[in-house]
């Protein structure tokens, strides 16, 4: 496991510095450090999102290729070479909700990330815990040591190969329903950047990729001893958290109230009516929500398909 600093170019993954200019402590880049199998931790992914658009596009493009197990970088040093990496790389990143602003671009190119969003309702308890931790020196390192010892004790290093947790047919179907819901709810809708009109025919993301990720998450939790009920709760939360936050608020409200007024969503979130209505329209395009104008107000209801899949996945 490698902790990354600021990643401001693809050179951070595979360095192409000429041999004569390399420092004694040069690592060759993050992918050389983890080798054929490992993990990269990015404690502030928000700083990457603040880069210039071209830089960001190149970094996200490299990450998408790494997801598929290979990445190559062409360089001009030492007469011109191509650097290659092959393997499995897990990435763990902490980021603010600003990542939702890049959702359409990321989703249109093929989403790879899954999300776990922390509840922001109990600010008092978070502040209390922060005060307690600030008066306990070394708690971060103690926590690292505990987690490392736990995984070492179970022989769960990235270098080891473990059998996956067996899944029954019923469990597989439940994960598939979660994946189908998650993929539709996070699918991109291509809009004109100025008029906001929808461009082109609907292209809903297939559920294969996120279903596989959710299945691996569920199996991993079962292997380390997480109770089955909690495994399902957390897997279901990650599935729904992987859509943008505003979409999640609309879906949750439509389910809880058997239909919700767009004005109510505006009041809860502080988002303008135009943005809320476009977000409802995005979900409607992918068959998650259906809208209806009643008395001059726009109401959102979950579709029959959504009701059916939610019952199968979150029963």
Task: Describe the predicted segments one by one.
Residues 208-209, 270-285:
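Short amphipathic alpha-helical interaction segments
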Residues 221, 257, 286-287:
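Alpha-helix C-caps/helix-loop-beta hinges
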Residues 74-77, 81-88, 98-236:
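Phosphate-sensing "switch" segment of ASCE/P-loop ATPases
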Residues 229-250:
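Short alpha-helical segments that sit at the start of domains
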Residues 243-269:
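Short amphipathic alpha-helical interface segments
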Residues 293-315:
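Short, cationic-aromatic polyanion-contact patches
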Residues 1-124, 272, 284-285, 290-292:
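Conserved ASCE/P-loop NTPase catalytic core
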Residues 53, 64-71, 180-183, 187, ...:
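Signal for well-folded cores of large energy- and translation-related assemblies
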């Amino acid at each position: 496991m490698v902790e990354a600093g600021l990643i401001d170019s693809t050179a951070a993954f595979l360095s192409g510095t000429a041999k004569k200019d390399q420092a004694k402590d040069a690592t060759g880049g993050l992918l050389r450090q983890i080798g054929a199998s490992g993990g990269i931790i990015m404690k502030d992914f928000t700083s990457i999102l603040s880069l210039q658009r071209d830089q960001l596009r190149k970094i996200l493009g490299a990450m998408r290729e790494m997801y598929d197990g290979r990445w190559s970088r062409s360089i001009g040093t030492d007469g011109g070479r191509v650097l290659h990496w092959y393997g499995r790389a897990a990435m763990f990143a902490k980021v603010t909700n600003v990542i939702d602003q890049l959702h359409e671009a990321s989703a249109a190119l093929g989403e790879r990330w899954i999300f776990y969003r922390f509840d922001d309702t109990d600010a008092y308890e978070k502040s209390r815990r922060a005060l307690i931790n600030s008066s306990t020196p070394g708690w971060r390192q103690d926590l690292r040591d505990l987690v490392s010892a736990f995984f070492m004790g179970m022989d769960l290093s990235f270098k080891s190969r473990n059998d996956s947790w067996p899944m029954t047919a019923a469990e597989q179907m439940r994960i598939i329903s979660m994946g189908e819901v998650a993929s539709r709810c996070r699918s991109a809708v291509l809009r004109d950047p100025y008029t906001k009109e929808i461009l082109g025919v609907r292209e809903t993301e297939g559920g294969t990729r996120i279903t596989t990720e959710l299945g691996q998450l569920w199996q991993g939790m079962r292997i380390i001893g997480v109770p089955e009920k909690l495994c399902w709760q957390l897997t279901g939360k990650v599935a729904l958290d992987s859509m943008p936050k505003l979409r999640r608020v609309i879906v949750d409200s439509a389910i809880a109230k058997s239909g919700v007024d767009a004005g109510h969503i505006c009041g809860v979130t502080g988002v303008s009516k135009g943005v809320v209505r476009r977000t409802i329209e995005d979900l409607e395009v992918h068959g998650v929500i259906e809208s209806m104008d009643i008395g001059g107000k726009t109401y959102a209801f979950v579709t029959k398909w959504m009701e059916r899949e939610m019952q199968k996945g979150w029963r």
